[in-house]
Regions:
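Short, glycine-/small-residue-rich phosphate/pyrophosphate-handling segment
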Residues: 24-25
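Generic alpha-helix signal with a bias toward terminal, lower-confidence helices
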Residues: 13, 31, 70-72
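Extracytoplasmic/secreted envelope proteins and their assembly/folding machinery
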Residues: 11, 31-34, 38
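Venus flytrap/periplasmic-binding-protein-like
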Residues: 1-18, 28
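Hinge/cleft segment of the Venus flytrap/periplasmic-binding protein
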Residues: 36-120
Length: 120
Protein backbone atom coordinates (compact mmCIF):
# COMPACT_ATOMS: atom_id res chain seq x y z
CA UNK A 1 0.00 0.00 0.00
CA UNK A 2 1.09 3.57 -0.65
CA UNK A 3 -0.28 6.59 1.19
CA UNK A 4 -0.08 10.33 0.71
CA UNK A 5 0.73 12.02 4.02
CA UNK A 6 1.47 10.39 7.31
CA UNK A 7 -0.80 8.96 9.99
CA UNK A 8 -0.89 7.16 13.33
CA UNK A 9 0.02 3.53 12.85
CA UNK A 10 2.66 4.06 10.16
CA UNK A 11 5.29 2.12 12.10
CA UNK A 12 3.02 -0.90 12.46
CA UNK A 13 2.14 -0.71 8.77
CA UNK A 14 5.81 -0.83 7.76
CA UNK A 15 6.63 -3.52 10.32
CA UNK A 16 3.77 -5.72 9.06
CA UNK A 17 4.65 -5.17 5.40
CA UNK A 18 1.33 -3.44 4.68
CA UNK A 19 2.88 -0.10 3.75
CA UNK A 20 5.47 0.08 0.99
CA UNK A 21 5.80 3.86 0.70
CA UNK A 22 4.46 7.04 2.25
CA UNK A 23 4.63 10.47 0.69
CA UNK A 24 5.22 13.34 3.11
CA UNK A 25 7.26 16.45 3.73
CA UNK A 26 5.05 19.09 2.19
CA UNK A 27 6.11 22.03 4.37
CA UNK A 28 9.10 23.22 2.27
CA UNK A 29 6.58 24.10 -0.44
CA UNK A 30 5.38 26.98 1.75
CA UNK A 31 8.94 28.01 2.65
CA UNK A 32 10.07 28.33 -0.97
CA UNK A 33 6.88 30.10 -2.01
CA UNK A 34 7.34 32.51 0.87
CA UNK A 35 10.98 33.13 -0.06
CA UNK A 36 9.99 34.00 -3.64
CA UNK A 37 7.48 36.50 -2.20
CA UNK A 38 9.99 37.76 0.37
CA UNK A 39 12.54 38.48 -2.35
CA UNK A 40 9.98 40.44 -4.37
CA UNK A 41 8.85 42.52 -1.38
CA UNK A 42 12.45 43.03 -0.22
CA UNK A 43 13.44 44.54 -3.56
CA UNK A 44 15.31 41.55 -4.98
CA UNK A 45 12.65 39.90 -7.16
CA UNK A 46 13.69 36.68 -8.87
CA UNK A 47 11.43 37.41 -11.82
CA UNK A 48 9.33 40.21 -13.24
CA UNK A 49 6.66 37.64 -14.08
CA UNK A 50 4.67 35.29 -11.83
CA UNK A 51 6.80 32.29 -10.90
CA UNK A 52 6.10 28.58 -10.67
CA UNK A 53 8.05 26.52 -8.17
CA UNK A 54 7.75 22.75 -8.08
CA UNK A 55 8.08 20.76 -4.86
CA UNK A 56 9.07 17.12 -4.79
CA UNK A 57 7.91 15.35 -1.67
CA UNK A 58 9.66 12.82 0.51
CA UNK A 59 9.26 9.16 -0.30
CA UNK A 60 9.38 7.28 2.99
CA UNK A 61 10.16 3.67 2.12
CA UNK A 62 10.94 1.94 5.41
CA UNK A 63 10.31 1.92 9.15
CA UNK A 64 13.77 3.48 9.61
CA UNK A 65 12.98 6.35 7.24
CA UNK A 66 9.61 6.77 8.97
CA UNK A 67 11.44 7.19 12.28
CA UNK A 68 13.77 9.81 10.76
CA UNK A 69 10.74 11.56 9.26
CA UNK A 70 8.84 11.67 12.56
CA UNK A 71 11.92 12.64 14.58
CA UNK A 72 13.20 15.41 12.32
CA UNK A 73 10.83 16.40 9.54
CA UNK A 74 7.51 16.26 11.40
CA UNK A 75 8.96 17.66 14.65
CA UNK A 76 8.18 21.40 14.86
CA UNK A 77 11.22 21.87 17.12
CA UNK A 78 13.70 20.73 14.45
CA UNK A 79 14.32 22.63 11.23
CA UNK A 80 15.69 20.92 8.15
CA UNK A 81 16.52 24.37 6.76
CA UNK A 82 18.73 26.25 9.21
CA UNK A 83 19.40 30.00 9.28
CA UNK A 84 22.21 29.79 6.71
CA UNK A 85 20.08 27.76 4.30
CA UNK A 86 17.21 30.23 4.58
CA UNK A 87 19.53 33.20 4.12
CA UNK A 88 20.85 31.54 0.95
CA UNK A 89 17.28 31.81 -0.40
CA UNK A 90 17.19 35.59 0.12
CA UNK A 91 18.67 37.92 -2.47
CA UNK A 92 19.53 40.37 0.31
CA UNK A 93 22.10 37.89 1.63
CA UNK A 94 22.86 35.91 -1.53
CA UNK A 95 23.57 38.23 -4.45
CA UNK A 96 23.98 35.24 -6.79
CA UNK A 97 20.45 33.94 -6.15
CA UNK A 98 18.32 33.32 -9.23
CA UNK A 99 14.95 31.67 -9.70
CA UNK A 100 16.71 28.62 -11.15
CA UNK A 101 18.98 28.41 -8.10
CA UNK A 102 15.99 28.67 -5.74
CA UNK A 103 14.26 25.88 -7.66
CA UNK A 104 17.50 23.89 -7.51
CA UNK A 105 17.53 24.17 -3.72
CA UNK A 106 13.93 23.00 -3.66
CA UNK A 107 14.78 20.10 -5.98
CA UNK A 108 17.40 18.86 -3.48
CA UNK A 109 14.72 18.10 -0.84
CA UNK A 110 14.73 14.33 -0.35
CA UNK A 111 15.29 11.78 2.39
CA UNK A 112 19.00 11.89 1.47
CA UNK A 113 18.98 15.68 2.01
CA UNK A 114 17.23 15.21 5.37
CA UNK A 115 19.86 12.67 6.41
CA UNK A 116 22.66 15.09 5.46
CA UNK A 117 21.08 17.87 7.53
CA UNK A 118 20.61 15.81 10.68
CA UNK A 119 24.22 14.65 10.53
CA UNK A 120 25.57 18.21 10.60
Amino acid sequence: MAAFDTFDGMKDGFDQGIIEVLVGGMYPDALFTFMALYNAVDGTPLSEEPVHLSQGYLLIRSADEREVYETYVADPNFRIYDEDAIKSMAGRYNKDLTLDKLQGLQDEFSMDYVMEQIQK
